[in-house]
């Protein structure tokens, strides 16, 4: 191979509005203590009514492009992962975001893999770059999850937040600046564990019931058990496949869904506290945006430096899951 795919830059963005746990007490039978004990979440950010996922994503994307020492015209492909797209079916959020960046006549499409979206993005970008088809790929996890939440359901609405993370994937000749490995998987037999109901209305010729509200639905206990079991196996597999041990990893950056899930994986693999990046306490579950947001924060805090090896993992609706070993190739 003449070159490898490399994560050249990372940036994140969150809306300004902080929503603390106690604020849910206004309309739900819950409390700050109840939420934090079960999830590790203390607060999250919610976008305003005018903001869409693409608006959050474009801010992160502009910074990622700048940090890669590129301009929007240098981007060959844009791929967005989101479960809260700007439009129901079309156009894709990637197309909308591309236009806001001033990118024209370049391919753009969305990926639907829920909370595993960013791992899927890495897999797609790695394949395109290493095939030689594209040189610079912009990948964005952007979520306005607040737009798909039922605020009468305390089992879901307390968990999520809004935000975005973006990366530029380019080329390198150095293995230790590359996206070393990505593995993704899915099992649709559990699709009813975590889903957003169909919102298209039936025709007047055979209408029997009203269309479902487009709110996120989740079987929390079942998802928790499957997530822990699946992620433990998946992370062990990718480390073993690459002849690596937990101590070889500079940063473990899991999907920020629930502190208890993260802690179960961390303890099983014996990661030290300084290896683990946690943002769930202040941003909640931002779905496809959570991993790039956590990466972006680690970079801005000086914890992530060029050549550092990251282990990423995620689990989400589909059900989908995946993990990645990524050297940071930026500066």
UniProtKB/Swiss-Prot annotation:
Residues 256-260 are annotated as: ACP-binding. The keyword Isomerase does not apply. Its EC number is 2.3.1.180. Keywords: Acyltransferase, Cytoplasm, Fatty acid biosynthesis, Fatty acid metabolism, Lipid biosynthesis, Lipid metabolism, Multifunctional enzyme, Transferase. Its main location: cytoplasm. Pathway: Lipid metabolism; fatty acid biosynthesis. GO terms for molecular function: 3-oxoacyl-[acyl-carrier-protein] synthase activity; beta-ketoacyl-acyl-carrier-protein synthase III activity. Homodimer. Belongs to the thiolase-like superfamily. FabH family. The last Arg residue of the ACP-binding site is essential for the weak association between ACP/AcpP and FabH. PANTHER family: 3-OXOACYL-[ACYL-CARRIER-PROTEIN] SYNTHASE 3, BETA-KETOACYL-[ACYL-CARRIER-PROTEIN] SYNTHASE III. This is Beta-ketoacyl-[acyl-carrier-protein] synthase III. It comes from Helicobacter pylori (strain ATCC 700392 / 26695) (Campylobacter pylori). The lineage of its organism: Bacteria, Pseudomonadati, Campylobacterota, Epsilonproteobacteria, Campylobacterales.
